Structure formats: structure tokens, C-alpha cells
Amino acid sequence: MKIIKKFESKKNKVLLVQSPDGSLFVKKIFANSQSCRNELQSLLALDGKCAPKVLGGGENFIDMEYIEGCLFLDAFLSADTEQMSSLAQSLWGFFKDYARTFKGYVPADVNFRNFILRQGKCYGVDFEEKIQGSLALCVAKAAAFALLYDTDENKKKAVCHA
């Protein structure tokens, strides 16, 4: 096993690993075993629909599919007004898939770093916590994140026109 890259994470250690056969996977090592169990349960329930597939795991780690793509945050920060619509649609698709699986619950953290875009589809990568709520709450949390995210270009382009 060879570590190819370390991903940014506040609480956990997240690594891109190359196995002896050359295939890539992500190893997420959790600071807390309960968080690991929560995430494993969510990933197994989502079964690859809008999240990485589980390849294996242990007491405090999960090995999962590597979804090659770009961070939703990076796409958001570089998008022009026209691209914002397709980004919003892809995030909405994730929220709908999640809501179908976890009726009455939404992801606790909708930081755009927790999503990857691949071929126009949005995948979530942080499932340690979920909270009771509706799709409307998900959308409101995402809108708040987008509006309050601190950027250099006047705190983000205005995408709504009066």
C-alpha cells in the first residue's frame, strides 16, 4: 500500500491509497469510533447512489471507492452565472437521493468541501452526522453556505438579479 495524497479534513485522517494491484481507494481514519460507525451505516445505506461504495473497514477506519472529480467548492468558486444553475441542479440531485434513503433526515454538514462533482453528478463524502429535517432545510443550509462563504471577489458573484 502506498499513500498517494492526504486530503484536507478537520477531524479525521483521509488518504488516497494505491493498492499493490495499482487500484486507488480512499482510507478514512476516524478520531472517534462512533463517527466511523455512523458513516459506515450511511455509506452502506446509500450503496454508491450518491456516495462512495464501501470496500472494507475496521473499528476506526473505512476503505471506500475513490471518486475522481473536483470538489464542489472549487467548482462553485470558479463558476460563472450560467454554470451556477447546473451546479445547483447537481447538488439538488444529491439531496433528493439522500432524502429518499434517509426519510426525514438531512446531512448535518453541507460544507461544499464535502461534495465531489464527477461528470455532472454530485457525490457526498462526509456522513458522520445527520439531523432531522426536510429537503427545504438542506437547500436552506446550502444557500446559507453559498451566501456566507468568504471569497476574494466581493464575497461571491451575485447570481440572483432583481
Can you describe what each PLM-predicted range is?
Residues 44-51, 73-118, 122-123:
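Conserved kinase catalytic-core helix
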Residues 59-71:
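Conserved short submotifs of the Hanks-type protein kinase catalytic core
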Residues 139-162:
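Active-site activation/catalytic loop segments of kinase-like enzymes and analogous catalytic loops
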Residues 2-40, 44:
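ATP-binding glycine-rich loop module of kinase domains
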Residues 54-57:
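Conserved beta3 strand of the protein kinase N-lobe
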Residues 33, 70-71, 131:
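Feature marks short, surface-exposed loop/turn motifs that line or immediately flank catalytic pockets
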Residues 113-141:
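Catalytic activation segment of kinase domains across protein kinase-like and atypical kinase folds
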